[in-house]
Amino acid sequence: AVAPVHLDDEALLRAQVNNLFLVNDSAGACPHIRTAIRKSHDIFWQKGLIFCQALSGEHDRAVLGVDLMREQGMDADSVFFKLVGSLLGEWEGKIDSLSDPTALQLAMARAGNLRLPSDVTQTRNPALLAAIAISPNADPEIRLAAAEKAESAGTLSTESLRQIYASIEFTSEELESALTTAEAIDGPRGRALLLRTAQVQDVPTAQAEVLLAFLASARDGGLYETAAYVIAPTLVEMAPAAELIWFAEEAGRVLIFTGALEQAMGWYDLAEQESAGIPEAGQAKARLWPLILISDPEEPTPLDGAMP
């Protein structure tokens, strides 16, 4: 149930209405809008009322509201008028650009089943990004681009992001040459391809190579932390082995960062065992130990030779 909000706090009421729009609860938002419009003629409430009238079949009232807005010179928001026109059956077309969307615009586009343009993911609003990520009227790759950013901002769960990654479709040719294809296409789709490949790969060295590429791509995109949480369950199940010593440092870092310290110690132990004869192992040992110590100050593993 929606908690009542005093109308003298219009900003709070507006935030509540926007939140309802973002969770696809326009039916819950409209009663608040109809109440608010009695005390405020702010453009936000006028647009909201027109949307609610269109949703409830009050065609004539919605048209009148649009006409009044235009008479008052409030016709700068061309996207709004297109969205209203679509809901009223008076406009057919597509939204070419929506780089700075509002919660109302997203709700209207969803109600009218209008496809969201690719630039909609340029918004920096985490709540809007989360809404875009779960919008059925957005193409899968647009949803994924928004989902990566939303997870990074904390407004979308990691599991939801994994599910959106899994929804991306690929050709058999792309799947057969995942590493080279992912490098060519890069970005969210490339990462989705790498993740799909890693999850079905049963050769540990090949799986590690793909996971390393996934992390590298995410790092380049400023999404390393997000990527770490996405692949953590896979790494927890991966057994440290001598043939994977080149992967020990990266695997250990991800596991430490995501709180899987016990599994991270397995990679540290591997690096320690191989450090005498393999410089790469010694480097992994030296770099992982301070991270382990910070994560668990009571860890009894000796420091001998661990620090660079």
Segments predicted by a language model, with ranges:
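Extended ligand-binding clefts on enzyme/binding-domain cores
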Residues: 85-206
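Residue-level signature for tetratricopeptide repeat
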Residues: 15-22, 52-53, 254
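Extended amphipathic alpha-helical segments with heptad-repeat/coiled-coil character used for oligomerization
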Residues: 28-123
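Generic helix N-cap/helix-start motif at coil->alpha-helix transitions
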Residues: 5-15, 39-48, 60-61, 75-82, ...
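Helix-turn-helix repeat elements of alpha-solenoid scaffolds
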Residues: 1-2, 20-30, 186, 218-230, ...
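Solenoid-like repeat scaffolds
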Residues: 3-8, 33-42, 67-76, 104-108, ...
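Small-residue-rich helix-loop
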Residues: 282-308
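Structural motif corresponding to the intra-repeat A-B loop/turn of tetratricopeptide repeats
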Residues: 23-24, 56-57, 258
